[in-house]
């Protein structure tokens, strides 16, 4: 009897310890988020007091005069991420559809391995590749052609004009697109693979083409997962540092076209934080706080979109 009582006590104690330990690990996530946010606010407080809301709108970044504004890094971050998504999403969609619907079995695994290898390449390698391969190629061959043919067209001069530097927003966005394609394509492939085969077979049995099955069966059934994959790619694009630092140009000048050198929040921090002090360091911390807020807003927006889609699907 005593042995059973002791065994029951040990099981109860172990169960209680297990629950409390796992709860502590879960709570650790919130503690880390709060610690990061608090440290960013404390570090940027001097800049917040000095510049207030004007920090978000001013274009200057002058360490000598101690005048700082964040609009150029913010624009650089958003523009490069937008270019990357504009290029990466349709390509990733095509890769995922090919792997799940069209590719023969012997070809699926090699392509999947290649995608995983692309995702595993360090970002600094992408940056070096972009700097030594893409930048000269764009400067000498691609940008001059685009400027000559599109730079004078009404409505397009804002995008394809200026001097062909090679480095700049467009090159950075293109390399960033190559970097996020493996992540988006992998998630889309997994999402498409969970579509019930009966739905697709029924559509094919009614005479639907592959395009019609994709448009009318696969996409409606997986649109929630598609939004999640795009938001994953956007989060990856917003926070990229090393590759962008190599090829964006690192210029605190308001861009007048997609070919203009610029900077992003992450690249500005990486370039200047090591030698910064005083107000400049606080301004860089505020840039980090802004990036934290932007990524959080993207996450919240994605959750709201997914919730909305789930509610619509349930009706």
Curated annotation (Swiss-Prot):
Segments forming domain ABC transmembrane type-1: 74-302
Molecular-function annotations in GO: phosphate transmembrane transporter activity
Residues in the Cytoplasmic compartment per record: 1-22, 99-117, 186-223, 303-315
Top-level lineage group: Bacteria
Ranges per topology, Periplasmic: 44-77, 139-164, 245-281
Matches recorded under InterPro entries: MetI-like, MetI-like_sf, Phosphate_PstC, Phosphate_Transport_Permease
GO annotations of cellular component type: plasma membrane
Keywords: Cell inner membrane, Cell membrane, Membrane, Phosphate transport, Transmembrane, Transmembrane helix, Transport
Location relative to the cell: Cell inner membrane
UniProt membrane topology term: Multi-pass membrane protein
GO terms under biological process: phosphate ion transmembrane transport
Record's signal peptide: none
Spans through the membrane: 23-43, 78-98, 118-138, 165-185, 224-244, 282-302
Family matches, as PANTHER family: PHOSPHATE TRANSPORT SYSTEM PERMEASE PROTEIN PST, PHOSPHATE TRANSPORT SYSTEM PERMEASE PROTEIN PSTC
Similarity remark: Belongs to the binding-protein-dependent transport system permease family. CysTW subfamily.
Function per UniProt: Part of the binding-protein-dependent transport system for phosphate; probably responsible for the translocation of the substrate across the membrane.
Name recorded for this polypeptide: Phosphate transport system permease protein PstC
Species of the source: Haemophilus influenzae (strain ATCC 51907 / DSM 11121 / KW20 / Rd)
Gene: pstC
């Amino acid at each position: 009897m005593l042995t059973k009582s002791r065994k029951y006590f040990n099981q109860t104690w172990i169960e209680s310890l297990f629950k409390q330990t796992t709860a502590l690990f879960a709570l650790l996530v919130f503690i880390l988020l709060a610690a990061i946010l608090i440290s960013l606010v404390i570090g940027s407080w001097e800049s917040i007091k000095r510049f207030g809301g004007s920090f978000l709108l001013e274009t200057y970044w002058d360490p000598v005069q101690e005048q700082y504004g964040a609009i150029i890094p913010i624009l650089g971050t958003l523009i490069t991420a937008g270019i990357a998504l504009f290029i990466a999403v349709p390509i990733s969609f095509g890769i995922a559809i090919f792997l799940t619907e069209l590719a023969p079995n012997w070809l699926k695994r090699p392509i999947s391995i290649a995608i995983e290898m692309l995702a595993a390449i360090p970002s600094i390698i992408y940056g070096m590749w972009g700097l030594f391969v893409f930048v000269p190629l764009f400067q000498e061959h691609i940008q001059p052609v685009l400027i000559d043919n599109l730079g004078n067209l009404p409505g397009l001069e804002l995008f394809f004009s200026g001097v062909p530097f090679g480095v700049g927003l467009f090159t950075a966005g293109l390399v960033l697109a190559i970097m996020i394609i493996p992540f988006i394509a992998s998630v889309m492939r997994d999402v498409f693979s969970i579509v019930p085969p009966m739905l697709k077979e029924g559509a094919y049995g009614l005479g639907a083409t592959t395009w019609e099955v994709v448009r009318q069966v696969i996409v409606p059934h997986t649109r929630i997962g598609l939004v999640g994959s795009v938001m994953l790619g956007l989060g990856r694009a917003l926070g990229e540092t090393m590759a962008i630092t190599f090829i964006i140009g690192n210029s605190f000048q308001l861009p007048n076209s997609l070919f203009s050198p610029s900077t992003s929040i992450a690249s500005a921090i990486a370039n200047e934080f090591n030698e910064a002090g005083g107000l400049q360091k606080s301004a860089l911390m505020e840039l980090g706080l802004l990036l934290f807020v932007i990524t959080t807003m993207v996450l919240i927006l994605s959750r709201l979109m997914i919730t909305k889609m789930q509610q619509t699907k349930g009706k």
